[in-house]
Amino acid sequence: MAAGVVAAGVLSGPAASARPAPEPPLTTMSIKSPPGSADVRVLIYHGSAAGGDESPVVNAGIEAIEDLGQSGPTAGRFKVTATDDASVFTDETELGLYNAVVFLTGGGDVLDPEQEAGLESYMEAGGGFLGIHDAARAEPYSDWFTGLVGARPAASSPTAVQRATVEVGDRQHPATKDLPLQWKRPDKWLNWTKNPSGDVHTVARVRESTYTPGTGANGADHPVSWCRDYDGGRSFYTGMGGTESSYDETEFRSHLRGALAWTSRISQADCKATINANYKAERLTQPNQPGQNDQIGEPHGLVTAPDGRVFYIGRGGADSSQPVITDWNNPDVGKGKGEIHVYDPKTKKVTLAGTLNVFGNKGGGDELIKVEEGLLGIELDPRFEDNGWVYLHYTPHSRIDRDKRMAERYVSRFTYNSATGRLDLNSEKVLLKWPVQIHSCCHAGGGLAWDSKGNLYIATGDNNSSGFSDGYSGNNPQPNYKGVSFADARRTAGNTNNLNGKILRIHPEQDGTYTLPEGNLFTGKETAEGGGKTRGEIYVMGVRNPARISIDKKTDTLYAGWVGPDAGSPSTTWGPAKYDTFAAITKPGNHGWPYCMGNKQPYRDRNLPDPSKPLGWYDCNAPKNESPNNDGLVNLPPVTSNTIWYSPQGGGPDFPRDANGIPSYKTAEQKFLLPWLKGGGQAAMDGPVYRYDANSASAAKWPSYWDGKWFVGDFYDADQPRHAVLLDPKTAGQGGIPVHAESLKKIIPIGNDGIKNLMDWKFGPDGTLYVLDYGRGFFTSDSKSALWQVTYKGGGPTPAADQLVREAQ
């Protein structure tokens, strides 16, 4: 090796802009396409812009890559040539021998313009490139080389070796598939002048909360390894490998081996899946005609049929130009139209399949005027293609009691006639019904979902006012209307004998009845506390307003999200701020509301005669329902910690706890376990778990990278979540928080002209994502209310199968 030293100095993007990028001269090089052969060869270039001895880090890197080439399975081996002579990049014959080029360089100009042009010709011919750590500091004045490596280190990057946690989000790329989900290792961690996420495919990120990133840090989304197809070839870069000891690590060597397998055409990989430009978001429905809901109602849920049609519902709010009736003396008070529309992707047309008269149209205003009831949820029977059965969760207007201000909620089965495109309203079979108070808004829930055993899950809200508790636990027993409490969620969500504030699980039968599957939270036959105090339909209790639920069709795991109360900050008197919540649910349980939130953070109890006075803290491990409005068990199941929770202050707020396990609830002492999200205005919208179908011929399906990732979102589109998260299977459903989160905000576009107010989202059988945008008002539809489709257009993995040098690895 020639004497030299890897430059510790460091030119960053801003400094580089002071000098214009030189125009490389035209080259007459003609490199065979693609370069290399089945006798795989890798070139390590370690040229230096400075004199002196070779860096020990570079020597360690060369030795590690040489060893990788001679070890492991025969099909993955390769030969290595290491050089610091840049003239190789102007020798078309020599350069064309190499399947991949590795840059183990320092900063500065390590290539002259002609040599850089040769490297560019090599990539255009289909070559592979692997840049390691300081390679991102090379060729600082070249825009083309910046694109090749993907990003430039910030001058403020820390120089000390620090131990940190790497989140390995890509579980399929050969460079990462064998690595731990959370990879803890020491290195010199680089900050980037411009975050490359969205322009490259990031396979791993470093978690800034686990080390000191210094000034110019990139935040929760801090890429550390990425790849992309670039200028005809394949480019992989890792910011790791900045220490000599890195190259002794088995897992880091595995990372390099996988990167070289892809860049040298031994293995395929998808390096396009998270590049924003590879997706297209298209509005499918048009604004309604004046005075009509010919395209869409007040958006409230969707489901896709096996043939690709999309069924979506309108809750019942009228077009804003239409009058509403709020006078309880009027028999038509709150009457609205719960509409079922169908979008056919083959004809690209919308039809109105049916309309139900629902209680749900009182417009906006305070909680004694507005209402969230109506047509709340839709699902299709697992054998829909054969029987045409559609299940609707709704509040029929015909069943309201205007005197007592009570209503009934139905889960009904209807038959859809595919030939006429109409729902047969006379075919209704009411499977399940239960009472709800309608004196005060809110929290109706609505989501429906099936598991693989034919069990139907039904999400119900706590049917409780948001007021009278200062935005903390909804546990004020005092307000009532004609004997029915409307501000005490212990009557509903915290009550083992009430179907509100729950996720129910039933098994619909052919005749329109239902049976109870084994394994619900209760059997309904419990004899505790005198008996008759449980409902066997309850699978999950303690949820506030679960508008959306989903079930992973591979694992049968239930996923849910629910909206929290209104307190803007935590209180040392009453407890946590408003937490919107997501939960991965693997077994029946109590998820806390209105006793505990987040990771078992308790509220303060209150009761008669003076609910304004705080009593003791709830015990999340042994909660008691001592409300005068409770007709269920006093002794409740222990609270299960949730997966994601967020407040206006940040994601996953947590506090120091005293000897009794009570958090301090002091704002200055809170830390955030989930720094990638934040609330404010917030309304959690659970999404699907994507499952990639390799047998599907759809060219627009989302890539396999997303397989197994859970989509979590919010009605609002600022700091609130719109992410795909990855859970550790070992802790999912047991209080484990996500190990990785990928922003979707540029794939599912935010903003007024995008999908600003996300209401529901589901993948169709073609692997494309359908999304409902609620619109810009409340309790109405408007010109922005729409059904959207998000499709993938990036193409398949690379290199193409016929360009692999050996049988696919």
Predicted regions and their residues:
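Asp-box/WD-like beta-propeller blade repeats and closely related beta-sheet repeat scaffolds
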Residues: 405-449
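Catalytic beta-strand/loop cores that center a nucleophilic Ser/Cys/Thr
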Residues: 72, 151, 155-232
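Residue-level detector of Asp-centered blade-edge/turn motifs that repeat once per structural unit
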Residues: 304-307, 382-386, 450-453, 552-555, ...
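Extracellular ligand-binding/catalytic regions of CAZymes and related secreted enzymes
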Residues: 23-39, 67, 210-212, 216-224, ...
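Secretory targeting and sorting signals
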Residues: 1-20
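Helical hinge/lid and interdomain linker segments adjacent to catalytic or ligand-binding clefts
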Residues: 41-138
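A glycine-rich, often tryptophan-bearing local segment used as a flexible ligand/cofactor-contacting loop or short
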Residues: 103, 108-179
